[in-house]
Amino acid sequence: MKKNFKKRVFFSILLLLAMYIANIFISTGFFRRIENTFDGSILQEIKIAGAEDITISQTDHFAIVSATARKKIPTTQQENGGLYYIDLTDTNYQPIVLTKNFEKPFAPHGISIFKKDSSYTVAAINHTKEGEFIEIFELIGRELTHQKTLKNERIFSPNDLVLLDENRFYFTNDHKYKEGILHLAEDYLGLAVSNVVYFDGKNYSEVADGIAYANGINYDVKRKLLFVASPRDFLVKVYQKNEDHTLTFIENIDCKTGVDNIEFDTENTLWIGAHPSLLDFSAYAKGDRAIAPSEIIKINYIEKGEYSIEQMYMEDGTTMAAATVAAPYGNLILAGNVMDAQFLILKSNKLLSKKLPFLEKKMKPHHENNILYLLDGKEIAPEDLNEIPPAEIKSVAVFKGAKEVSKYTDKKYDGVILIEIKKEN
């Protein structure tokens, strides 16, 4: 009798253990089929190592890249990185180092920018051996000046942040436990104990918790919606921002992939770099695998219960391992990753956003007589832009400089900016 009881207990434990192991494999996408898919091409490789986060100013046409030369995660040594500026109207896409005069240890992770008047506030997560910090900079033109370093016990395991203005922001902590069995439980069992913290310029307060590996975060100003990536649960969590900056949970979006950083296009569609297999990513991050698969998705979020998810890119990691961010611009996608020696500028055959004003608003005030619009290869007057039905637009491209523009038109003069529009056939 006792022997039978012990056997039942033993087999029950084995069954529970098998269920736990199976859950780990299933919930992390281990069995997911990876198929190389992208309707487009690689426009350029930008030689910046570990370009983990990228954000774009759609109005001023530049990208800020946060990069750290990682060898494996976690690291035992101080890593080195920087912030970079890329002019998106210059088709050479030459990165400019912004932080070469920043003398503190600097291994940036998530970043955010906020424009006020003619300057930008740039905030960056900074991982150092002395602790976790948030660095605040001011960007004027292409000159970045460090303003202050923020340190607090609530900045515990910071991953990403989003600025509301030059002083206030939300940020994510991706873990509650730094090490030990509970840290492993967060990674492998999906223990949901990470959080979102709000900083009002003076005080820190937790505004959301119970998240499995809180990662990328972004804020839709018009709708007052905060989006938080939970890659361990394959979710994007949606919150309503209240007047007092507390958050009200709305719903989870099941993305079926390990969502990472969140960016917006001009129509506030979410663009997300993602890890379709978290176990493969974990092995890659630790140095046990040479590559890990990459995925890019976009989410058109309308309201609670009404949204669509579209896969834009997937591959096995041979071209780009472990994609973390997908920042859209026109029909380009700036796709960053964890540890590759370069990030990719992808050119989609699809128009990513069908709004044209973001181009005209930037160019026209500063180049009143130096803008050329081409519609299907023929010059078009600016006032005729509004006559083009958005649904008929296939692509929009921006070219700057006499050399580039001469490929498309006989008008060859310095300072010209050409906006080429192609319609659906």
Where in this protein do the model-derived segments appear?
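Short, conserved, GDST-rich strand-edge loop motifs in beta-rich repeat architectures
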Residues: 65-79, 125, 171-191, 272-293, ...
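Blade-loop segments of beta-propeller domains
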Residues: 70, 78-125
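Beta-strand-rich domains and repeat architectures in extracellular enzymes and scaffolds
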Residues: 43-81, 339
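Loop/turn-rich, solvent-exposed surfaces of beta-rich toroidal or solenoidal domains
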Residues: 256-312
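Conserved blade-ending motifs and adjacent loop-strand segments that build the rim/top face
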Residues: 43-47, 52, 251-263, 304-329
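Short, small/polar-rich motifs associated with maturation and membrane association
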Residues: 355-425
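Asp-box/WD-like beta-propeller blade repeats and closely related beta-sheet repeat scaffolds
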Residues: 103-110, 114-165, 172-179
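Surface loop/turn motifs at the tips and blade-to-blade linkers of beta-strand repeat domains
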Residues: 44-48, 97-104, 149-154, 206-212, ...
